[in-house]
């Protein structure tokens, strides 16, 4: 069994439990453009306890890139710790339109135009390159849970393999992919 030194995870956060106004769900309210119950059902979700119970064959010294939204920032930190990682910093993807303006779609309270990645470390693994990577990326919005290739390229520059993408929707060349939507074949690298 492969033991991974770098894990990228985009968990199926349980938005269904947040509920509309008046349901008592976490105190959050559905607002116009919030994730609809049908979109939540389309993508499925897992409870926080089920996410914490996942066992990942991880090296003693490893990196975790854990995607989250504003609504699950606290739970994401808890999840990283439950998997044996210590959160170190937050990387933010500012989703922009072609003209550079924010591409906000859904959200609780405010319309979200960002997605966050908690960078966490297990053991004492350092970055493999200098600290020239920014903590803010201004990249176009992509389909649900799809990350830009530039994100994976950055991960490969600063974190060692073997690589695992957990809850993958595509299979990147040179990476293992776990998830009920992960294709069986890896995408060939583009020249």
What are these regions (language model features)?
Residues 1-191:
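Class I S-adenosyl-L-methionine-dependent methyltransferase catalytic core
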């Amino acid at each position: 069994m492969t033991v991974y030194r770098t894990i990228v995870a985009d968990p199926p956060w349980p938005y269904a439990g947040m509920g509309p106004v008046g349901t008592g769900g976490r105190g959050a309210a559905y607002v116009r453009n919030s994730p609809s119950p049908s979109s939540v059902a389309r993508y499925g979700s897992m409870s926080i306890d089920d996410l914490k119970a996942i066992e990942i064959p991880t090296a003693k010294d490893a990196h975790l890139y854990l995607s989250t939204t504003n609504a699950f920032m606290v739970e994401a930190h808890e999840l990283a710790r439950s998997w044996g990682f210590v959160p170190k910093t937050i990387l933010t993807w500012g989703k922009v339109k072609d003209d550079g303006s924010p591409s906000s779609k859904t959200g609780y309270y405010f319309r979200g135009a960002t997605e966050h990645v908690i960078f966490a470390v297990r053991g004492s693994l350092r970055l493999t390159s200098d600290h020239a990577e920014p903590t803010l990326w201004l990249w176009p919005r992509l389909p649900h849970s799809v990350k830009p290739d530039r994100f994976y390229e950055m991960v490969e520059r600063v974190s060692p393999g073997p690589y695992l993408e957990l809850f993958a929707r595509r299979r990147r060349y040179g990476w293992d992919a776990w998830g009920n939507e992960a294709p069986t074949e890896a995408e060939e690298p583009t020249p």
